[in-house]
From Swiss-Prot:
Coiled coil: none annotated. Its EC number is 3.6.1.1. It comes from Cyanophora paradoxa. This is Inorganic pyrophosphatase. Keywords: Hydrolase, Magnesium, Metal-binding. Its cofactor is Mg(2+). Monomer. It is an enzyme of class 3 (hydrolase).
Length: 25
């Protein structure tokens, strides 16, 4: 897949979204 993370403003949330995309959930 492709890792799609939208910048919400906080780097913590960004990493969290990226992690979820990586996990595939």
């Amino acid at each position: 897949x492709a890792i799609t993370a939208e910048p919400v403003g906080t780097p913590e949330t960004l990493e969290y979204r990226v992690f979820i995309q990586k996990d595939g959930k």
